Structures are given as structure tokens and as C-alpha cells.
Amino acid sequence: MRFLSTRGQTPPLGFSDAVATGLAPDGGLYLPESLPDLTGDLPRLAALDYPALCADFLARFATDIPPDTLRALVAASYPRFTHPDIAPLRTLRPGLHVLELFHGPTLAFKDFALQLLGELYGHQCRVRREAINVLGATSGDTGAAAIHGLLGRPGTAIFILYPYGRVSPLQERQMACTGAANVHALAIDGTFDDAQTALKEILDRKSVV
């Protein structure tokens, strides 16, 4: 599977290279060249638990990573979730169901993606024998989830900008009080938009990226 930039000005990449690169050099986002048709697989997929479903789905896009390796990465992504089903479906009454997405380490639904992304980054570090630095700006939950996805992970460092006094006390503690040497939570005097602007200016510097 190849991944193309939304701006169309950079060569396509495989899954692993797209993950390691992040933003495309032309400033676009990487999207898969095509989407698989899951229609015929829906009954089988519906019977899988969350890790098996995640590994099955990911294998359709991460075609440059062996299936056994993908399954191991997915299995390592969710032990910190506090419910054995990871995303339990609760029935409130007949015909009314609620999917619980708050059992991750930061209580945010973004833990589902960012715990897995941390494992994928760790895999890239081991395979490439190169360090990965992650830069981001947040208004709260994304930054905390990203930090906890990379918490203490060898070969990685994460730098998160957030507006001082404009995130919840819980989110600030989740970002600033981890004690992990590879985590750098940086409060700025300004708004979330100011944090994003500063991040874009940093990423535009070729000496940085």
C-alpha cells in the first residue's frame, strides 16, 4: 500500500516511511492510495475482539510490516487500558447502546490511536536504528494522549506546546508530571492558535526537520 500527500507534490511512500515522516515534505498529510472494500469481511470482522480487529485492519495498510509483527505491536498497545474489552459496548436499554472510549491511560478516546502509534514509532526506531522526535501543539487531550503513547520509550522524544492556563488541571498534570526523560511539555503564554503558529514556524525551519 502506498501513501500519497494531499498536496500531491511529493513522491508516494510505504506505510512505515509515512509513519516515520509524519507531515509530507510539501506540507500535506499522507493518505492511503486506496481504501479496501470490507463488505464481504464484515461478518468475520464483527466476531473479532478489539486487538484482533485492529491488527486485521492495520494489515491492509501496513503491507511492509510482517503480519506477526503487526499483531505483536497491537498486543503491546493496550495493556494500560483498564477494561479487558478495551472498548466495551454497554446496553442501556433495548436498541440503545453506548461504546465506552475512556478506559485508556489519559481517559481520552485518542488513546486508542496514540498508544498504537507509540508502538509503531518504537518499531521504526528499532528497525531504522534512528531516533524519532515528535513535535505537537495541543489544547489538552491530544497532547496528553500523545505523551502517554511515547512515555519512556527508547529512541523517542516528544515536545508538546500548550497554552498556559487554558487546559484542564488534569490534562496539565498528565502532560507535565510524568517524570519521563523523553517528555517535554512546554507551556506558552498565549492561546492554542499561538502554540500551533509557533509549531508551524519550527517545522518550516529546514535545520530542524
Where are these regions (language model features)?
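PLP-dependent amino-acid enzyme catalytic core
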Residues: 1-209
